[in-house]
Amino acid sequence: MGNGERPPARRPDSSGSPPPAADAPAASNHPFSSHDTKHMTSRRLASRTAVAASLSALMLAACGGDDSANAPTAGGAAPLTPAVASPAGPTGSTPGSTPGATTAPAPSSTSAGQLSVDKMAFAQTHVVPSGGLSWTLPNASASLRPISRRDALVLVAIGQADAVQPVLEAWKDGAKLGALALSPPSALPPTESGGRAYANDRWSAVVPAAWMVPGVSFSVSASNYTSSVAQAPVFGTDADVQLTILPFYLFGADDTNSPPLSTTQAPDAATQQEIFAKWPTAELKVRTHPAGRFSLATVVVGPRADRTGAAQPAYPVTALDQQKDGYGVMSAMLTLITNMRTANGDGPLNDQYYAPLIALNSNGQFANLGGGLGGVGSGAAVGDHRYTGIFIHEQGHAFGLNHAGDEYAKGAYPYAGGSLSGSVWGYDPNHREFLDVLVPTTASSYAKCASSHQLDAQGRCYKQDPMQGGAGDQSSGYKFATFSDYNTGRMQAWIASRVLADPASSTGYSKWDSAAQARAPYTPTTDNNGLYGVNQNLPVQAGVPVHTIVVSFSKAGSAGASYIYPPFSYTGNLIATFDPTSAADRQAITVDKGTYPWYCKGTGCDYTLRVTYADGSQTYRVLQGGFRAWWTPTVDDANATNPLSGSSFRVWAINVPGDKRIGKIELLDTPMVWNGMPANPTVLLSR
């Protein structure tokens, strides 16, 4: 990309954070969690193979959703394509249909004496045909494929009613991997809450994760028929997802007056299993951030409207009830955790961050947060500590999902009003049962759902997606309601798009190649001439001592809004940053001429962090981005000094070497620092 090309679109806000999606407070009567969790928990959930000694089937998995508010009315907009109402009783085929979804046809060339397979599907998070599902909508497209390297319940409809002792065979590269006896339709797993049967003609078996890989094909034989035509599933990514939990204890909250770290630092084991059942990943790894927690006495809220809609300047908060709207502190914390994730080199990776916010009011009492925020596609979200509907909804935003009802209205979601009317069924391996698209009788929403949900021809309620009022649509015993197949496919796409730290790769990184159905070595590159960082902000040093420093700054001079947060130290990563006292580093970021000619071109490089260690040594780091007009790094933005504008407020986060204790942190005024470092720069802030 040449230096003279048209500038790329500016990112949504001045701090570099994705736009958050605000969610109405979710009703909750949960007390403080009392589950005991080891300090600094790090749990690893791999897909589990549960093949019985007889090699007949057990069940596998998708665990449903639970979420936020704003369910549509039953009289909402019509589906993009007509939905077919699900039949009431047992059926020989999957109940329901999938508007807008396309399934790959099964092989059909069968010779005499050969077993025919009418349908083959794999139940993981959802019941997905071997060729996958795909959608083409007016303003979006998506696909959902069987998940590679994850156990699956295979479901087979056999064409011959007299087949005796059918067996599923797995083959790869001409070699037989093994065979599984198929359980008869009478042994099919039940449906949640004792609901209608998924089907009455499906034979089944649990396929181990080792067989659920590209290149494997499956055929079915019987003692009285030869093997069927083989089907090779089209697989989605085999990537894992890491969930990093970083609790924020705010305004004096601690283990004596609030839910303790032992219960906030990670979901309990059962909840982790349910999250894994929900997300389309081969493995879920849950860890508490190596810092443990981040305790803050003060939080700075950026310019935003108050409860009445009136614009307010940035301001400091020392108790939750001081915020001027219900999402002020959450918004500030989402910006912090998003920027900290980037500073640690986790931005492009398959790592989702979640920050439980534990806060006190001005009376010193624990305050119920009542909601959450997630940066759409950012990989980061904040919310309460209970790991229920708020959590799964906000992490949905982090995966790139918006509110499903809004997306339906825009032609970017296939099912009316953000519902599951038309989705394939889900499946949960932990309960070993199918998840209907209809609200189950044991759901808390069941009794009154007709006034707020889409209805089928018999007046029964369809579930809402967790991204549109699904909280309460799950069966008793579940924490989360059921995502639609479409939104699960979009989560799978987010996972597939991530860079994977991969020791098996020659470069140390890999990415999923959907066409090849395989990981390919990935070499980090600097996009957009360094506009958003170097080498995609991947680590240049990993697993080293670091100090994370967060600075908020109001160029408008709003009272108390310019603030250096207390640093915290842990074992983390360092990304490429620049020392303005080095001529070589200044040359590298010189606008339009340096190695990274756009590094400072977006909104300037006018501020420097100076860190003085306890031994007197110092380190300097340029803070990328400031208050310049977009693509004019020598001219201030028109609203740079307008206290009511987000253009007057900035939050930076940066990691610096942490092998020595910090003595002082200073923010320096260094205008257009690529031209030279001032001999005696003005100190704007000091801690």
UniProtKB/Swiss-Prot annotation:
One of its GO terms (molecular function) is metalloendopeptidase activity. InterPro entries: Dictomallein, Peptidase_M66_dom. Binds 1 zinc ion per subunit. GO terms for biological process: proteolysis. Zn(2+) binds at residues 393, 397, 403. Residues 233-501 form the Peptidase M66 domain. The active site is at 394. Keywords: Hydrolase, Metal-binding, Metalloprotease, Protease, Zinc. Its EC number is 3.4.24.-. Its cofactor is Zn(2+). It comes from the Bacteria. Residues 1-45, 73-112 are annotated as: Disordered. SUPFAM superfamilies: Metalloproteases ('zincins'), catalytic domain. Signal peptide: none annotated. The keyword Cytoplasm does not apply. Belongs to the dictomallein family. This is Dictomallein. It comes from Burkholderia pseudomallei (strain 668). The lineage of its organism: Bacteria, Pseudomonadati, Pseudomonadota, Betaproteobacteria, Burkholderiales.
